[in-house]
Amino acid sequence: MWIVKGILSSVVLKGHYSLFSRPPPSSLPDYALRFLHFTCCRSSKIMFSEFDSSNASISPELRQENAKALDSCYTEEQRAVILQRLNTATESELEQVKLLRGRKSVNIVKYRTRHGPFSSLESVINVPLLKYKSAIMVFDSILNPDNKRKRNKGKVHLAKFIKPDVNRAHLEDASSIISIVCGTNKIAWAHMDRARTVLDWQQAECQSFMKGTYLASDYLEDISSVISSFPAADFFLVEKPSISPQNTSLFPVMVHLRTVEAMLFALLSQAREPGSPPKVLNMMRISVGRHFDLMVGDCRTSGAETLRKMMTDSVMKRDPRVLFPHDLVLKHRNSFQMSSRNKGEEMCDALLQAVAFFELLQE
């Protein structure tokens, strides 16, 4: 006890950090040091955050430097070729350039209409959805449109969008394909040729699908009835569903889709000679969604709006992305409105899958 009292009295009355002692003039109290440390950290944090946001608002000088760097990456002749293409190409012509499919080509045409032709390569970055890196890829694709095609000769990297492996030459020689998409109660298919002309486009109700007790014989009868109306084609393209097995609530739907997929492969496949390609192929649903910019995270949204635009362009434009016969436009023009979205979703997906197949082959 006496020892504790002695220590406390020495700290309170005589110590260097005692409560009643005044610190030397040359030293700073502990709270002052802590305050200075906090101030330095706080000011450095503000400066760092300002540096991170400078690209957006506070440093036009950096933007000018990026502009000079971007324009200096190309010769005067190359810049002229790039600007000529971007300033004069139609929307359908822009879609042939890598990374300019979908909304990017639409945004370029809108920007030209509103602000006039592009005066420099840097001005292209002002177009929505086009940033520095993607702009460089677009410029390089305009200057060297055949580079990627030369690199991809031989087999297609089918892990990207098609299974099983098929030699690229066989795919490019196809004069027409039939694209097939299965739903919970129907099967839709689209017959399209190499020129992306829709030759036929139908869907059929399947009464046995996901109703009552599953009977393989009923499934087989419904599917056989659908494929009996298929015309001749070089390849049959069956959509590969993208339902995650971890989503247990959709497990019955996944089993149903896999069952129909297996039956389609069995019924449409024919005995083939050694070395000949398979006629029935899978195409990844996610790959088609990414091709048309329909992905939101890992989920694919409806392609009805994209399809309606294709049908309108087929009537209004001289060189449309897809050519629809007039009778099919009249027959299906109201099938893809928001009020009837579920009615024609499988037909929409079947046609977009066929378009994506031929367009991906051209890359």
From Swiss-Prot:
Biological process terms in GO annotation: mitochondrial transcription; positive regulation of mitochondrial transcription; transcription elongation by mitochondrial RNA polymerase
Localization annotation: Mitochondrion matrix; Mitochondrion matrix, Mitochondrion nucleoid
Main location: mitochondrion
Presence of keyword Heme: no
Transit peptide segment: 1-23
GO cellular component: mitochondrial matrix; mitochondrial nucleoid; ribonucleoprotein complex
Pfam annotation, one family: HHH_3
Deleted gene: phenotype: Morphants show reduced movement and have abnormal neuromuscular junction morphology compared to wild-type animals.
One term of GO molecular function: DNA polymerase processivity factor activity
Keywords recorded for this protein, A-Z: Mitochondrion, Mitochondrion nucleoid, Transcription, Transcription regulation, Transit peptide
SUPFAM superfamilies in the cross-refs: RuvA domain 2-like
Keyword Repressor found: no
Function: Transcription elongation factor which increases mitochondrial RNA polymerase processivity. Regulates transcription of the mitochondrial genome, including genes important for the oxidative phosphorylation machinery.
Family of the protein in this entry: Belongs to the TEFM family.
Protein name per the record: Transcription elongation factor, mitochondrial
Gene source species: Danio rerio
